[in-house]
């Protein structure tokens, strides 16, 4: 593909609008969840959680498949298909008249998101040449990817309070249609032009089913316990299916995932580091939202507004990171971000039950925003640098899967830790005590991501990565 046949920055704007919708819908529902429970007569909180879980289940489950199929059949094509599915599902969510309908339509929305996200990242990687240009583009994409989660809390509260919970879904319809029309006009098509002897259907089925079983088990672990049948059986199924997938890939003529791609040290390191970092970072929104509602007594809209400084900090940090990474390398920039994020988690772990927003929560939010903004862009760049265009969709699918599964695993483990250190869930002081342990665990996850990055990217590996990518003028790793 000719990278200069279209204005790449127009393409980036279109991609960012689509990605914004995807990350927005991962959090926007949380603020309106109890309004939805009342309106659609959910029988219990256990059934209510499926409004969130069904989206995550299909999103995480189909990411890898969506990324690889986009490589083979056309990234733009699957980006457009994902937009259509996501937009139609959003409309159906908004007009749902029963709990079952909403859960089913949210699953469909998650499927659309799984087609959009890897295609979006791979389109950026194939549109922008390696080096400063791609670094700046990924800085913008990273700010949208992280900041959109915080905006979702604000927008969800505003729409629910001023209009109706249905508008948290309806808002996607005009945005989706406009993004679709713009993508048809401006986004160039690209795909792997090599001749293929067939498609790895068995690999596609096993990895998708395996990832869905894993996320399903994680979703039930905090509510039912790690030894519950609802948790253990999906984990066993996931282990069998994913082991079968690896075996299939070693024997397939046209594997869905060429296992040799993990020999690219930057990709392997980026995925492991992001898996661990997201295990801690994802919980930040969840437990801080609970702290704001339960300890500080904020309402839905005010809770969303409390995260606005975080959004601003992420935007600033991602911009700074995209400027620094080409000069000093992605590893030191990401390392500083991880250290700042660990500091933020430690501050959160010390918040008192009678604390105030300005003195007890805001400092951690600001430091955390600078840290997370500095992590996301360099690690994303590391995951996509030094690869052929034909592998960008696969790399994007792997990277997005690492985030989603890492986030689900981290939230499940940290929720269990919080619960085990909470004497009485109805007593705010006890709940906050549990949050402290959860944030401490989150700090450990992020610290481990730093250890993994430093340990795996040793000097000779860094030299090898830079030598492989030197022709493209890649951003230095060290």
Locate each region found by the language model.
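Intrinsic disorder in cytosolic terminal tails and internal cytosolic loops
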Residues: 1-7, 193-196, 456-478
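12-transmembrane solute porter fold
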Residues: 8-31, 227-241, 247-425, 430-463, ...
């Amino acid at each position: 593909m000719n990278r200069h046949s279209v204005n790449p920055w127009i393409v980036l704007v279109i991609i960012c609008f689509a990605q914004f919708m995807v990350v927005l819908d991962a959090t926007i529902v949380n603020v309106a969840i109890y309004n939805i429970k009342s309106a659609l007569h959910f029988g219990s909180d256990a059934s209510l959680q499926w409004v969130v879980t069904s989206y995550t289940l299909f999103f995480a489950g189909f990411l890898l498949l969506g990324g690889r199929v986009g490589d083979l059949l056309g990234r733009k094509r699957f980006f457009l298909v994902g937009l259509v599915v996501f937009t139609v599902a959003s409309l159906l969510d908004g007009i749902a008249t029963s709990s079952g309908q909403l859960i089913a339509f949210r699953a469909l929305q998650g499927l659309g998101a799984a087609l959009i996200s890897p295609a979006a990242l791979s389109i950026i990687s194939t549109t922008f040449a390696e080096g400063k240009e791609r670094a700046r583009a990924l800085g913008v994409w990273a700010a949208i990817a992280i900041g959109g989660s915080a905006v979702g809390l604000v927008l969800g509260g505003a729409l629910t309070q001023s209009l109706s919970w249905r508008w948290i879904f309806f808002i996607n319809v005009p945005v989706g249609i406009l993004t679709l029309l713009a993508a048809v006009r401006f986004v160039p098509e690209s795909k792997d032009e090599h001749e293929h002897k067939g498609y790895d259907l068995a690999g596609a089925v096993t990895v998708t089913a395996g990832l869905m079983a894993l996320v399903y088990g994680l979703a039930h672990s905090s509510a039912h316990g790690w030894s519950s049948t609802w948790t253990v059986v999906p984990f066993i199924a996931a282990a069998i299916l994913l082991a079968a997938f690896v075996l299939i890939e070693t024997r397939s003529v046209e594997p869905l995932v060429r296992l040799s791609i993990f020999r690219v040290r930057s990709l392997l390191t980026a995925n492991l580091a992001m898996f661990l970092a997201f295990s801690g970072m994802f919980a930040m929104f969840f437990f801080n939202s609970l702290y704001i509602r339960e300890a500080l007594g904020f309402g839905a809209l005010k809770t969303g507004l409390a995260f606005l400084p975080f959004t601003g900090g992420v935007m600033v940090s991602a911009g700074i990171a995209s400027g620094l990474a080409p000069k000093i390398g992605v590893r030191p920039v990401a390392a500083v971000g991880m250290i700042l994020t660990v500091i933020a988690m430690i501050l959160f772990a010390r918040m008192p039950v009678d604390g105030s927003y300005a003195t007890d929560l805001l400092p951690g939010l600001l430091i955390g925003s600078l840290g997370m903004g500095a992590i996301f862009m360099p690690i994303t760049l590391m995951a996509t640098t030094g690869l052929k265009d034909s592998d960008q969709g696969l790399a994007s699918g792997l990277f997005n899967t690492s985030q989603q599964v890492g986030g689900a695993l981290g939230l499940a483990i940290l929720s269990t830790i919080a619960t085990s250190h909470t004497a009485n869930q109805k007593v705010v002081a006890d709940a906050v005590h549990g949050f402290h342990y959860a944030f401490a665990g989150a700090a450990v996850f992020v610290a481990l991501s730093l250890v993994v990055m430093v340990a795996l990217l040793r000097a000779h590996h860094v030299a090898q990565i830079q030598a492989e990518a030197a022709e493209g003028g890649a951003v230095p790793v060290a």
